[in-house]
Amino acid sequence: MAETKPAERNAATGGLLGGLIAAVQNGLEIARFGGLEEREPSPHEIVAEGRNHRLRHYFPNQRADAGPAALLVPPLMLSAEIWDVAPNSSAVAALFEGGADPWVVDFGSPETEEGGLDRTLEDHVVAVSEAADSVRAATGRDVHLMGYSQGGMFCYQAAAYRCAVSDEDPGVASLVTFGSPVDMHRRLPLGVPTDLIADLIDNLSRVQASIFPNGIPSWATRLGFQLMDPVKAVQQRIDFAMQLADREALQQREGMRRFLGSEGWVAFPGPALQDAMKQLVAHNRLLQGGFVIDGHSISLASIECPILAFTGTTDSIAPAPTVRGIVPAAPQADAFEVSLSAGHFGLVVGSRSMEITWPTVCEWLEWREGRGRLPERVKPMAAPRDRENDTSTLDNVTEGLSVAFDLGRDLLGNLPGIASRQVGFLGRLTETIFPQLPRLGRLDDMRRDTAVSMAQALAEQAKKSPDGTFFLFEGRAHSYQAANERIDNIVRGLLQCGVRQGQHVGVLMDTRPSAVAATVALSRLGAVAVLLQPDTPLAAQLAVAPVDHLLADPERGPDAVEPYGSDVLVLGGGGDVRDLGPGLIDMEAIDPDQVALPEWYEPDAGMAGEVGMILITGDGDQLGINRVTNRRWATSAYGTASACALGPGDTVYCCSPTYHATGIMVCVGGALVSGARLAMATPSTAPSAELGHVDLDRFWGDVRRYGVNVVGYSGSMLGALVSGPEHPTERSSPIQLFAGSGMPKGIWKRLSARFERTRVVEFFASTEGNAVLVNVTGRKIGSVGRPLPGGAELSVAAWDLDAGELIREESGLAKRCPRGEIGLLLANVDRARGEMAGRPMRGVFEAGDAWLRTGALVRVDKDGDYWLVDNLANLIQGSAGAVPALPIENVLTTELEFTDEAAVYGLTLPGLEYEIPAAALTLRSNAKLDPLALRRKIQNRLVGPHRPLVIRVLSRLPKTAGQRVRKGPLREEGLGLEAGGGETLWWAPGEEAYVPLSPGDVEKLIESVRNG
């Protein structure tokens, strides 16, 4: 005979004994049958099904006007029944009764779904977007996306994803989230470096993979959820026990009890868990941007629809400050908040949610539909306040790396022991220094025959992290494995075209992934990449750097055929059959599978002492070349990675040309060897050599879309950031660091003032030799820092500015320059280490030594920090001796409020055999020149021979593609009286201010110079 449930106990039974009997009866019934009674869920139908989800429509066809479409998304770990737990606690029923049209995304139980435990984070986000498409198609309405906990995070991501993949309306009417954190780092203890958290998460991922290789089972997710709030879990059990005698009370809580007890929990797919922990927790991508969904780089900054976020005052899983991270993450959206006196679960289930949450949501929908007012409980959300004494990772890195660099290259082998004894490191410093030691040690151990190259670095990353993102371009993400395969295919194409080891191959390309791919492919093949400048006449470049083959992009190829005089190889822009025209060979048309590898080919065989690439230097008719050995490239790459403490969680933004040293060696190199992501500037964002500025809207769009936290620069490239108005997304920017070389002191000073929490890492690298200096801390604005451990040994020799030669002792050996005085920077030549020899000076400080002149005049302060005084080529050869131009430029740009940029140079006047100091200025936005203040500042700060006698005020300065000022054209224009487009002033004797210079004043100027 089938068992039947016992009848309800007699209501008249009372007293202590009756309560005890009722408690026993109810307890036995729950134990035997799993619950007090079965209930029917709210009516619904499955209207669509995807690879990773089913779409439920609740209360279908029950009224003519279905109302606003609300699509509810559950979190991982919990089933879709979270939205319909019990008749008295049903979100879908409450929404329907409030006039909405409820739909639910059902991810199912991953442990029972085919491939369910293999799902990734992006699988769920794409599923939400597909469900939104289905709802829009069925209703003809935009969708209100609603999500609980991680389901809300999915909604944020899906909305941003829809903005990225379509130029049309994303179709999201609003976003409503419940306990959905955005700023995951808000939960970290103060002072704990996020790098350590990333490492911990990486290790935990390995542990999870070994214990639960297929993901976290449902019982473990339930236990984990309870452990997040153990007090709440215990309280719920006590409440349940206390109510065992009250059947009516038990029935009201029955659905919730069964849901939380076992039925509501599902497995957490392993890949999705690892994605969430790495992208959302360790790298904080919801706040910073740059999470990758279906190959697209996404940022919440693209969201424009209104957002309503519910927070719980006792929510220990998603505290309000973590939820409020949506304000800086989505600055274009209007964000609102409802704060409840509830915990995490109580936001969506239970009496509190039925009294407040769902009625408020219904009122919100009415307001969004234009049929009501903004709900009274809904308040504008304020951005989370900065935490006091919040020590960022970069603060720790700054301190730690400063100590590491101070200890120097010679101590690398024993650094951990020495550092712990001398400094102590207080724990956190240890963790920021030690990860850099293998990089610095690798440089220190490198010898001439050490295998190292760009291609080898890519191969290492492709093996270590094949699915990791290598570079981001035009909104798409490309993995190391995909890039490595692309390089191999290009190599086969080059071999088919006759390129061999050791040959010099010109690369004539704009800044794009194909330019990087071509350079790495030539490195893999063993050829030398000659990186040509697209805006410099090709014939002039080939005259100083002859090539055996020329490789160009489709835009540059046609114009290169005539000056090159032979067939030009074209790479990039492939996909369709195309006719490029005469003299052009389409490498994209070559089938790599049909190319046989020759016996001599050995991939990634480059050694430290070999030339890996050649850069074009100079401008106009003063072009030169810079031979970069593989060691020199490695020094810049590993030096950047170490000084900036780069890792897989970082995104480096490259807006420098890839044919410039900063682009290919600092940005590409640093990202490549560290595993950081390389974000390449959208073409129109990259600075123009003529305009000298960046498109700020696109720049900030790229920064948010890619989650950029490190921006590479060269020269005055960042001037636009400090000259323009504040951008709407600037204050919530994820940028933590600017890294590059040649930043003018004036721009650096203004940049540090405007971006107070952002550090500047300034590099100096000599054209000859392997001299590398780096200012790790950025505290001394204008300093080039200290020698990079692993680089060449450096020394400063005393220099006679007037004679233009070394100052020697009586023995004939060079005198070492005392600290505080100006000297010539020399780099020691160590052939065994694979350093470029060039034309060294021998017997400099002792018999038999060999040093290279870097051409840089420097001064070393009492702390050991180097300051660039000027380059020998820029010295002004005045009547009283040589005058450095850089200190004059620093006065003009750092001590006058109206000056933007300045270039100081030597100018020759008719009848004079020496030069006079001249300056060209640009003014800050909306600023006016003050000739009186200008003259007074120069008179007070500079001595006679250092005072510019002629000053030109221009709208812009001529610059190279690397944003360095081209002083040659300024010298050629002379006084600028015939050049037009500017004003020329001069230092007239007896005047209090600089006065305009007319053609009739030129003789007066010359006479005043002769008279001193």
Predicted feature locations:
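Gly/Ser/Thr-rich phosphate-binding loop
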Residues: 673, 700-701, 708-713, 722-799
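Alpha/beta-hydrolase-fold enzymes
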Residues: 2-16, 141, 154-271
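Conserved AMP-binding/adenylation subdomain of ANL enzymes
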Residues: 634-651, 659-709
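Conserved AMP-binding/adenylate-forming
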Residues: 476, 491-536, 657, 882, ...
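N-lobe entry segment of adenylate-forming
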Residues: 388-478, 482-497, 602-606, 993-1012
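Conserved C-terminal "lid"/linker of ANL adenylate-forming enzymes
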Residues: 903-908, 918-920, 933-1012
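AMP-binding/adenylate-forming catalytic core of the ANL superfamily
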Residues: 515, 540, 711, 823-827, ...
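Conserved pre-ATP/AMP-binding loop-to-beta segment of ANL
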Residues: 575, 582-622, 629, 643-651
